């Protein structure tokens, strides 16, 4: 595979890798598989021109191990050397795959023969890997002994450490709000447990960018410097644990299993490694790493799992060695930082031994030893970090420090930001309590130092986050309290934003998830065009859809967030900035007709019947027009001749209110195929170019009849400057739409039918008894109908995150539930560990499981063994898909269990409502426990009568199948009395032909103790 075509080779839990810290050279962590054949671009003449900021273009780009800068220089330095000089004669079990892939000959091959072969670009890169692999001993069965202290690799080059532990970041715009929340949760996790700080990038030269590169899941290890560097979160990598792992590489960690001493702790089973992935298991040299005094960490979040890059899910590639005689340690967790990870990061960044990161909305801290007295030469740092848009109130309730001039010896410094270079809010000592200190933003830095021998009791301080407030700056961010975690109940926050005079306020949402309600009655975000609650309402928002970008009409914007005391969601994150209305300029933005302002820009548009010229500002007469007729015909320019090139025609068709417009094509022939890249016809409901799109059409195939959603249609035709075709001819006509007025009285969807209409509810809601309103169906449904359809929440749209839904399906007694899937698309995972659908063979989740499903392949039909089936659907916090739809129905027959209590059996699922169906063949086996027999009695019996019961009939056998003695064949009014089995089972067979059908039968069965008189009475 090339850099442009990554492929996930293992399931996410096999992408686990845990960690060492980078040694001086740039190294890259990936969780993907790439073919060595595709690195031709590494053989260019100027290595200095490579973009190391993009992991895909760096030399370090292979799987989970990579080359460093020195390796890359080695490649170019030796580019013209004889391939035979690269240890071609060296053989080793671990290099067989490389030799075979490289096409290397035997050891006796001459240099001239080798040189006569055409050397493919990139082959030297492969030989470098082979050379490194060849230096290792086979660690599957051998253990290296060493008296050296256990190494845990850490960078020895200070330029790879982020100065002050500050890592600026930016997030690319193509990520969803849920993904952004996961990134921030992962960064908060690192901040909470170490002294590393992630801050949104402002003007910093070096920073990381969350992006989606072709390398999939990858990152540089440590700070690259000199500009942005990518941390790629590719497909299926947007999980909390995986992002924490990738951030570990950014901080400076490398993979644990590549340590020089790894063979003392794990065995590498090379024969189980996927071909081409052997380089992921190479060891680092002892000279490449320095020790931080930390032992090998099986629990590290940077460690590979046992089957990473395995030929099969159940084959180990890394096997932990047993500690003493105990069980093997678990490796590959992706839940949280281990204690070893935390300890090593603190050593790498020289974190103070005293202090912590405080992220709760309120809390307290105190000097070490308080109130008994702090020790001399103490250094502590506390970092308070709350949600953007909140401020921090800091109160000192006790203060007793050695007092000196200018607080030179013992002191507390409070800074208005995330580090020691932030603005100083106060330097405190002595015993005088300061006034409450309020931050200007969402972070405070508190540093305590003692250097005197005269000690005091210390201090005690408490803080609280307050949301809302006046914000006077040209750009910034606001978030719901506690974002990206769920917001807190009973909160009210009001922000009053003011930007510079002469500008407007722009508001753009990155994430939005607030408790849903039709009228946003419970939790909501309210935005007003001004500086108070009395100004014009722009919108009140809730639910899961991000609001459109918002723009004020002045330099002020009022925002209110409110939550009630019950359901809490992830909340929102939004950026605000100053915005200019270019269309308000005297020259109308340079547009000859209409100027439309957009956030951050503007565009020129033309009136109907005109089109933009090449300068995108002027308008000229065009084909198309404004049509108000109820019926008519529209044709391409020049019809019936070929249409001209370089045409752009727009027709706007308007019918009276409560009418819909249908468009039917007689002829259609445009250049192109299904891509519609050159000439095309675009049809929308509405009059603007951003209205709902019905379709974009080209080629020779006529579109189906298209009906508008309202009383307007926009038809746009475009041709390029080359091929012309015959064009199109279409007839339009109008029909009254009852749904267009007040939505037909329907709360959700009104569906117009010919001469009438019906109301429908969105998925997750059910229609009220009044036929118009909708009520929430909830996610726990008990289904008692004989048959029906179920679907995931919001189907066919993407299901919501963090959802758990259950369905308890119960069909007619004596029948089995059959489930057939008609649509299926759930996040893929080899073990369905994330989003999944579970089916159980009974009325609840304690029954035997029938299967756990995910992915995009429709499962085969599933049949329960009884008349109950239980379904549970679960979605996690990240990837969402379309979901599923399935139909359930009763399947006659099956194996039934006779118990002491009476159970029912019916001839068909619609018994009592409809006669039994024709051409049916059903078999039931009723089984009792050992020592018990089966008693069968019929309450109702009505089957087509015939003297020999040759048409429709019921047969009863004294055993498990038709080889057992037959107790009788019955039709008409059925058996005259109850029946008893001689053993522990009875089989019932019901057959109908293709003609007359009757009411059917209703039987009851129980288990009884064997009594000879009863059980032999049938004889």
Swiss-Prot record:
A GO cellular component entry from the record: extracellular region
UniProt binding sites for Zn(2+): 245, 249, 255
Segments of this protein annotated with the region Disordered: 83-116
SMART domains: CUB (SM00042), EGF (SM00181), EGF_CA (SM00179), ZnMc (SM00235)
Active-site residues, as the UniProt record annotates them: 246
Location within or outside the cell: Secreted
Entries under PROSITE patterns matching the protein: ASTACIN, CUB, EGF_2, EGF_3, EGF_CA, ZINC_PROTEASE
Domain CUB: 354-466, 467-579, 623-735, 779-891, 892-1008
Propeptide part(s) removed at maturation, as residue ranges: 32-152
Signal peptide: 1-31
Bound cofactor: record note: Binds 1 zinc ion per subunit.
Entry-linked Gene3D superfamilies: Collagenase (Catalytic Domain), Laminin, Spermadhesin, CUB domain
Glycosylation positions in this chain: 174, 364, 395, 631
Every EGF-like domain range: 579-620, 735-775
Pfam family, one: FXa_inhibition
Main location as per UniProt: secreted
GO BP: any one term: proteolysis
Function of the molecule: Protease which specifically processes prolysyl oxidase and maybe also chordin. Required for the embryonic development. Predominant protease, which in the development, influences dorsal-ventral patterning and skeletogenesis. In embryos, inhibits the development of dorsoanterior structures and ventralizes activin-induced dorsal mesoderm in animal caps.
Protein's name in the database: Tolloid-like protein 2
Organism: Xenopus laevis
Organism placement in taxonomy: Eukaryota, Metazoa, Chordata, Craniata, Vertebrata
């Amino acid at each position: 595979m090339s850099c442009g075509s990554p492929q996930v080779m293992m399931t996410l839990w096999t992408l686990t890798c845990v960690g060492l810290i980078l040694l001086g050279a740039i190294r890259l962590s990936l969780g993907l598989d790439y073919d060595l054949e595709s690195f031709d671009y590494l053989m260019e003449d100027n290595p200095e021109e490579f973009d190391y900021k993009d992991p895909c273009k760096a030399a370090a780009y292979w799987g989970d191990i990579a080359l460093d800068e020195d390796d890359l220089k080695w490649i170019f330095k030796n580019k013209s050397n004889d391939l035979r000089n690269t240890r071609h004669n060296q053989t080793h079990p671990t290099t067989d795959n490389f030799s075979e892939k490289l096409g290397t000959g035997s050891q006796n091959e001459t240099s001239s023969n080798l040189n006569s072969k055409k050397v493919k670009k990139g082959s030297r890169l492969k030989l470098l890997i082979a050379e490194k692999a060849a230096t290792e001993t086979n660690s599957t069965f051998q253990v290296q002994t060493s008296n050296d202290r256990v190494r845990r690799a850490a960078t020895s080059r200070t330029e790879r450490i982020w100065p002050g532990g500050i890592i600026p970041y930016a997030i690319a715009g193509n990520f969803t709000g849920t993904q952004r929340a996961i990134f921030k949760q992962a960064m908060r996790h690192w901040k909470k447990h170490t002294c590393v700080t992630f801050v949104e990038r402002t003007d910093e030269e070096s920073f990381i960018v969350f992006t989606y590169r072709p390398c999939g899941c990858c990152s540089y290890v440590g700070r690259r410097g000199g500009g942005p560097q990518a941390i790629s979160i590719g497909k299926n990598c947007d999980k909390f644990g995986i992002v924490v792992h990738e951030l570990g590489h950014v901080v400076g960690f490398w993979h644990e299993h590549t340590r020089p001493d790894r063979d003392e702790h794990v065995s590498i089973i090379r024969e189980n490694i996927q071909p081409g992935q052997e380089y992921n298991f190479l060891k680092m040299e002892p000279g490449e790493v320095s020790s931080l005094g930390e032992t090998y960490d099986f629990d590290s979040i940077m460690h590979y799992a046992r089957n990473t890059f395995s030929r099969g899910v159940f084959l180990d590639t890394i096997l932990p060695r047993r500690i003493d005689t105990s069980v093997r340690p678990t490796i590959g967790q992706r839940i949280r930082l281990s204690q070893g990870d935390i300890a090593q990061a603190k050593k790498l960044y020289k974190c103070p031994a005293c202090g912590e990161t405080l992220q709760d909305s309120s809390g307290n801290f105190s000097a070490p030893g308080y109130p008994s007295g702090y020790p001399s030469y103490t250094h502590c740092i506390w970092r308070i970090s709350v949600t953007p848009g909140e401020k921090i109130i800091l109160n000192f309730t006790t203060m007793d420090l050695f007092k000196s001039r200018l607080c030179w010896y013992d002191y507390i410094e409070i800074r208005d930001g995330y580090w020691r270079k932030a603005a100083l809010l106060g330097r405190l000592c002595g015993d005088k309590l300061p006034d409450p200190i309020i931050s200007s933003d969402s972070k405070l830095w508190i540093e305590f130092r003692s250097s005197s021998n005269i000690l005091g009791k210390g201090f005690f301080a408490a803080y609280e986050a307050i949301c809302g407030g006046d914000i006077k700056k040209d750009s910034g961010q606001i978030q719901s309290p506690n974002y990206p975690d769920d917001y807190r109940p009973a909160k009210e926050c009001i922000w009053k934003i003011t930007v510079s005079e002469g500008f407007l306020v722009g508001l753009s949402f990155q994430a939005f998830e607030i408790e849903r309600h039709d009228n946003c009655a419970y939790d909501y975000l309210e935005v007003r065009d001004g500086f108070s609650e009395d100004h014009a309402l722009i919108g009140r928002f809730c639910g899961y859809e991000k609001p459109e970008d918002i723009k004020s009409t002045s330099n002020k914007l009022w925002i209110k967030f409110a939550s009630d005391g019950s359901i809490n969601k992830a909340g929102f994150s939004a950026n605000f900035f100053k915005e200019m209305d270019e269309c308000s300029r005297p020259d109308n933005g340079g547009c000859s007709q209409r100027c439309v302002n957009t956030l951050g820009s503007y565009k020129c548009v033309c009136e109907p019947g005109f089109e933009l010229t090449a300068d995108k500002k002027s308008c000229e007469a065009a084909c198309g027009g404004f049509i108000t007729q109820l019926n008519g015909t529209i044709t391409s320019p020049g019809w019936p001749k070929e249409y001209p090139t370089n045409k752009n025609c727009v027709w706007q068709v308007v019918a009276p209110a409560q009418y819909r417009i249908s468009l039917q094509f007689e002829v259609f022939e445009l250049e192109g195929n299904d891509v519609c890249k050159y000439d095309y016809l675009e049809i929308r409901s509405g009059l603007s170019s951003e209205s709902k799109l019905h379709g974009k059409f080209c080629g020779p195939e006529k579109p189906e009849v298209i009906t508008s959603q309202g009383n307007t249609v926009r038809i746009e035709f475009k041709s390029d400057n080359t091929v012309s075709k015959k064009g199109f001819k279409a007839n339009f006509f109008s029909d009254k739409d009852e749904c267009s007025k007040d939505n037909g009285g329907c709360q959700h969807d009104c569906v117009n039918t010919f001469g009438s209409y019906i109301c429908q509810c969105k998925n997750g809601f059910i229609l009220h008894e009044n036929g118009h309103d909708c009520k929430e169906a909830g996610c726990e449904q008990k289904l008692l109908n004989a048959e029906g359809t179920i679907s995931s929440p919001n189907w066919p749209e993407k299901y919501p995150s963090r959802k758990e839904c259950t369905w308890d399906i119960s069909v007619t007694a004596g029948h089995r539930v059959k489930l057939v899937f008609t649509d299926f698309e759930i996040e893929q995972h080899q073990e369905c560990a994330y989003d999944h659908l579970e089916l159980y063979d009974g009325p609840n989740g304690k029954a035997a499981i029938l299967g756990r499903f995910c992915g995009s392949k429709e499962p085969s039909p599933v049949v329960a063994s009884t008349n109950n089936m239980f379904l549970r659907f679960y979605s996690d916090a990240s990837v969402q898909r379309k979901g599923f739809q399935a139909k359930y129905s009763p399947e006659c027959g099956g194996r039934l269990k006779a118990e002491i209590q009476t159970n029912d059996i019916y001839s068909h699922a619609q018994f009592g409502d409809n006669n039994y169906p024709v051409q049916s063949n059903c078999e039931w086996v009723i089984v009792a426990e050992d020592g018990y027999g089966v008693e069968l009695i019929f309450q109702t019996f009505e089957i087509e009568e015939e003297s020999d019961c040759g048409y429709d009939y019921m047969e009863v056998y004294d055993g498990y199948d038709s080889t057992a003695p037959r107790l009788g064949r019955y039709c008409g009014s059925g058996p005259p009395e109850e029946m008893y089995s001689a053993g522990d089972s009875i089989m019932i067979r019901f057959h109908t032909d293709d003609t007359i059908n009757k009411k059917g039968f209703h039987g009851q069965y129980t288990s009884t103790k064997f009594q000879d008189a009863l059980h032999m009475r049938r004889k």
